[in-house]
Amino acid sequence: MNLTHLDEKNHPKMVDVSQKNITQREACASGKIYMSKEAFEAIITNTAKKGPVLQTAITAAIMGAKQTSNLIPMCHPLMISKVQTHIEENKEECSFKLFVTVKCEGKTGVEMESLTAVSIGLLTIYDMIKAIDKSMQITDIVLESKEGGKSGKYLRS
């Protein structure tokens, strides 16, 4: 297997994308956070002491997408043109599922930006509600879809 982030001496390197074409890139990732009923109720009734949890998580997810190249060593800085979030609440499971779609025109994809955004958004929920429930679980952070670039479309089955 040829790993593009390693040189011939197995040293890490940032991939040279200068010869790649600029194309539309889009990726969507998702993840879930499970919590106690008390924590879930505090979020949906907007009574958490740290403020509006879901709105803050959305803002954090957007910031996370924009900061990806500062957090993941081999990621290129990108001119992101769109970050869109969607949160599904599941009362029976006491969980929230966060979806983040990131879009840009560039020479490299935005998969890492969408995955980072989901991670930061869910971590923000954890941070804001941990006084009520320290046993929350963040799970199932996955790439749902991507399109653009040489590898084409991907859709999680």
From Swiss-Prot:
Keywords (alphabetical) are: Lyase, Molybdenum cofactor biosynthesis
The protein's enzyme class: lyase
Q: Pathway involvement?
A: Cofactor biosynthesis; molybdopterin biosynthesis
Q: Where is substrate annotated to bind?
A: M74, C75, H76, M112, E113
Where in the sequence is the active site? Answer: D127
Note the Pfam families from the entry.
MoaC
Q: Which transformation does this protein catalyse, written as a reaction?
A: (8S)-3',8-cyclo-7,8-dihydroguanosine 5'-triphosphate = cyclic pyranopterin phosphate + diphosphate
Any GO MF annotation of the entry: GTP 3',8'-cyclase activity
EC number, UniProt record = 4.6.1.17
Question: Does the record bear Glycosyltransferase in its keywords?
Answer: no
GO-annotated biological processes: Mo-molybdopterin cofactor biosynthetic process
Recorded family membership: Belongs to the MoaC family.
NCBIfam families linked: moaC, PRK09364.1
Q: What does this protein do?
A: Catalyzes the conversion of (8S)-3',8-cyclo-7,8-dihydroguanosine 5'-triphosphate to cyclic pyranopterin monophosphate (cPMP).
**What binding partners and quaternary form does the record give?**
Homohexamer; trimer of dimers.
Q: What is this protein called?
A: Cyclic pyranopterin monophosphate synthase
